[in-house]
């Protein structure tokens, strides 16, 4: 719950304007991010915090994600080193849960978004 609240707060404040997911972890029929899509961001309790619209979608290998993208993710000290360390832990656990092996060349979906609506329910 805490991490959900923290991430939603970063998005609402306009600090977090990007996110990354691992392409290989999507289910076969699961929709991938695409430009123009609207997303409801939930807080840690599952309540709507805001609505975002996807502006940019790129598929980039994990080890090629840029410092600029890491900065726009808005987490920690916003450095590429922080981004890599945190996403490495997250992706390793996610890949292990799917009985797959993580490697640094995995394709990542790097998404940039803007906030188009903020919930007034806090």
What is the predicted function of each stretch?
Residues 1-26:
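Compositionally biased, charged N-terminal/linker segments
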Residues 27-32:
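Short, surface-exposed secondary-structure edge patches
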Residues 35-42:
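Loop/turn positions that initiate beta-strands
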Residues 44-46:
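Short polar/acidic secondary-structure junctions
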Residues 49-58:
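Short beta-strand-centered aromatic/proline hotspots
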Residues 60-71:
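Short, solvent-exposed secondary-structure boundary/capping segments
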Residues 77-122:
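Contiguous surface segments at macromolecular interaction interfaces
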